Structure formats: structure tokens, C-alpha cells
């Protein structure tokens, strides 16, 4: 048996993303959403495709929000979801590793686990969030759909690169280009503006394909060296004027530079099975008693 065949499969779930996806399809109906999600995870548990499953819940991050007030400020705050999410987590923690951190984003926890575990296992992230596509350069896979407990739709390298095609349909060339390209473009869904307003897409692609330095950890000194490789004087001047914006966007968007010390932020979360709470949302006991 080959080394690739020997590798265990590990699933990391972006629970907040899955909750929002299922809730939107069910037009905000909490009982239907909880039942559907429990049905999904019961199937995943029974099918045993993955040797280990991590369910990641969001904490209340401070640093990013404190430093940049617009970060994710365009998202609707829905306090009503926290009670059903806790009820849902009370079931999932009986069967899976539910993890999170009080003052860190779920995305950071997912990225930390994925990049470390991918060194010895085949790691799959269940989410529809494009933020995780930057991790594909490390062999991490993103699953966007399950069918009968099995991973059904896995984003290919070609599909990932096509998500960042230009108006002529030209995709990015390599997976490592995704992060710096997004840094320059920004992400309106997270309230992150373009790092260099008005910069042409062709100039951004030139920078990430020809000038960006990928073999060293990102820093402002590295950025200055990258800018030094740009031959066009006008483009170089634009980059110099926007150094602070580029640094800001990189800090907000990068999931590849999380230090080993981040591990101390991750906690295993376990709730006693909330049967009373479940009875308000779920009619079938077999959906939470597997």
C-alpha cells in the first residue's frame, strides 16, 4: 500500500458557514435548519469516511476588529442564532471534537489545524468560504457539499484558480497566487477594501506572478523588496503610497502565517446534551441520539 493510501482522512468543519448556508436555504427556519444539520452530521458519523472530525465554532475575536473597525461590519448581527447553535453544539460535542477559542476567529482555528494536520493526513475543510482556498497550496482540500454522509463536491485546483478569473476569463496561474491577489483586490463580503484603489487587474497579476516573493514569511521589509522588483515607476509609486493598506489587508486575510504559539488559543468545547433545548427544535430523537 502506498504512503498516499495510508494517509488518514480528517474533516474540519466551518460550523458558522454551514449554519448560515443551511439557514438561508430554509428561509430562516431554525427547527428545519437544526434538523437538517443533525441529519448531515449523523450521516457523516455513520459513514466513517473520516478518521477524525473537528467542528470549529466562532469565538469573539478582538484584535482584527479593534484595529480595523470596518472588518466584517457589513454582516448582520443575529443574536437569536446563539441559543440554537449552542443546542446544536451540545449534540455534536457528544460525537466529534468541537473546538474554538474565546478571542480568535473560527477561520484562524481551521487554518491552524488544517496546515498542521495536512503534514501527515489528507485534510478536508467543509465550507463555502473562499478564504480557505489559499490553503490548497499545502494540500488542503475544500469540500462544499456532502451526499449521504460522503464528501461529494471537492474544489479542484482548476476550479479554485477560476474563481479569480479576470474579465477575459483568464484564471490565476498557481495556487500560491491566491492570497496576494486577494490582498490587492480586497473582499467586500468582509468589509475589506482594495489595497490600491484603481489598480488595474493586469498590474496586480504581474505583481503576484513576477514580483512577489513566496519563499519567505511576509513582513513590511519583504514587501519593500517586492516593490523594488517592480520596474514600472508609476506602479511602484502607487505601491509605496499604499504600503499601509497592503499590510492591513494581508494581516486581515492571511491564514498561512499563523504561528505555533496560536495552539494555546484553541480549546475543546463540550456541552452536556441539551435535551430540553432540542425538544424545542427537533421532533425526531434519533437525530440527536445516534
Q: What are these model-derived regions, one by one?
A:
Residues 2-4, 27, 50, 73-281, ...:
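Extended two-metal-dependent nuclease catalytic cores across DNA- and RNA-processing enzymes
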Residues 2-94:
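Domain-level signal for Mg2+-assisted phosphodiester chemistry and nucleotide/NA-binding surfaces
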